[in-house]
């Protein structure tokens, strides 16, 4: 799976799965356009892999759209940006809801729309991978807004695949289990919480960011040219049991 001569836009590229994707795609020859709200992350990516960085707060819809226009026409889009606000159902706040849905769902849809507009104008083709979560399939304590955002993005992935397919644009999603990133540490750092969750995985471990990135690269590649509208669990068998 080589991507020489191709360009990929990656949201949330500064950390976690997004950064792992940036490194892997660059290693395989792609030019990386990295979107992040943290300038230091963009600077380090530029030094490490030569990524072109665009600083943007994806909580701002207008800024998100402007950043995608600035990014220009690309061959691939990876929607990796995501946040979580841990609140119980009874304690959920509008601020938490707006923050999580704004970045995890609304920003992803804006990015898909602008990417698709540019691809259609260029004659079609290309591929998108949205990063969702097993939280969209199973109920986890304090993950109400996060689960809603990820389940919503999976539904959107299927609609995007249907509407963009005639233009030769494939759209898929990956649904990782808990992945060893800073975001996951906020929710799963307590062994009393994480250990019972880990043993529910047939492989008896959580995912590494690089493992999720490899699955994303597979879906973007021509090896998956007949795959669209799919959600690939990267979960060590969690959803199977």
Descriptions of predicted regions:
Residues 7, 14-15:
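Conserved glycine-rich cofactor-binding loop
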Residues 88-89, 93-101, 197:
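Substrate-binding pocket helix/loop in short-chain dehydrogenase/reductase
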Residues 90, 138-144, 166, 204, ...:
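Active-site loop immediately N-terminal to the catalytic Tyr-X3-Lys motif
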Residues 112, 149, 157:
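Active-site helix of classical SDR
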Residues 133:
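Residue(s) in the substrate-gating loop at a strand-loop-helix junction
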Residues 138, 217, 228-241:
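Short C-terminal tail/terminal secondary-structure segment
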Residues 165, 170, 227-229:
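Short, small/polar-rich loop/turn modules that mediate ligand/substrate recognition or access, typified
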